[in-house]
C-alpha cells in the first residue's frame, strides 16, 4: 500500500526479476524506504571495516570510501565510522557540485583523494574527466583548485592523479589512456606544468606557515 503496488508476499521482493517502483510524489514512502535501506547498508559496510581495522591494525586512520559521487546517506555512514571523508573530485574547484556546508556538519576532515586536469593536445588521446583546451591551461587550473581547497576549512589535503600519463593503448583495467600526468609515457616531464605545480605548492606551504605563526 505504501508503495502503491500489489504484492502477494514479502518474499517476492527477493525475486531477481522484481523491480521496485520509482520514487514519486504520490508515494513518498518509496524514497524514504530507499534512503533507510541505503543508510543501513552503508552502516553495515563501514562498521565491518572499522571493527576489523581496530582489531587487526589499531591506531591506524581509516580514510573513508573515496567517493566518486556524494550520496548523503552513504557519506553520513562514512563519517560515523571513519576518521576522514575522502572524495575523488573531478571538478574545476572542490566546491563545484559538493555541499561543503553539509560536509562540515558531519564534523570530519575531508581528503580529496583524486583530482586532475588533462588536455588532448599533448600525450595520449584522452583529456580525462576534467579536460582543458590546451596544455598551458593545466597549470592555472591546478593553482585555482589548490587555492580553493585551502580556502575550505574542512579540507586537509589533496592528491593529484597521477604522476605518469596513462599508456597510449590504454591501461589494463579499463582502457583509460589519459594525458594528466606530470611526466609523459617516455618519462619526460611536461616542464611548464611541473614548474606551475611547484610554484603553487610552494605558495601553499608558505601560506600554511604564515597561518601557523
Where are these regions (language model features)?
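C-terminal structured "cap/appendage" subdomains that terminate the fold
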Residues: 129-179
Amino acid at each position: 500500500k505504501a508503495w502503491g503496488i500489489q504484492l502477494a508476499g514479502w518474499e517476492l521482493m527477493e525475486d531477481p526479476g522484481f523491480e521496485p517502483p520509482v520514487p514519486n510524489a504520490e508515494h513518498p514512502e518509496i524514497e524514504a524506504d530507499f534512503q533507510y535501506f541505503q543508510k543501513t547498508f552503508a552502516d553495515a559496510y563501514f562498521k565491518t571495516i572499522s571493527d576489523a581495522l581496530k582489531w587487526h591494525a589499531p591506531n591506524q586512520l581509516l580514510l573513508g570510501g573515496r567517493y566518486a559521487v556524494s550520496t548523503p546517506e552513504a557519506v553520513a555512514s562514512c563519517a560515523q565510522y571513519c576518521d576522514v571523508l575522502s572524495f575523488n573530485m573531478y571538478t574545476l574547484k572542490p566546491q563545484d557540485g559538493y555541499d561543503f556546508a553539509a560536509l562540515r556538519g558531519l564534523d570530519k576532515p575531508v581528503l580529496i583523494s583524486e583530482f586532475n586536469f588533462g588536455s588532448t593536445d599533448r600525450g595520449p588521446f584522452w583529456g580525462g574527466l576534467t579536460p582543458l583546451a590546451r596544455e598551458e591551461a593545466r597549470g592555472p587550473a591546478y593553482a585555482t583548485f589548490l587555492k580553493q581547497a585551502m580556502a575550505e576549512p574542512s579540507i586537509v589535503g589533496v592528491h593529484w592523479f597521477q604522476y605518469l600519463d596513462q599508456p597510449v593503448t590504454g591501461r589494463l583495467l579499463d582502457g583509460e589512456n589519459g594525458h594528466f600526468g606530470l611526466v609523459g609515457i617516455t618519462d619526460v616531464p611536461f616542464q611548464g606544468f611541473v614548474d606551475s605545480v611547484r610554484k603553487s605548492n610552494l605558495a601553499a606551504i608558505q601560506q600554511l606557515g604564515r597561518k601557523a605563526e
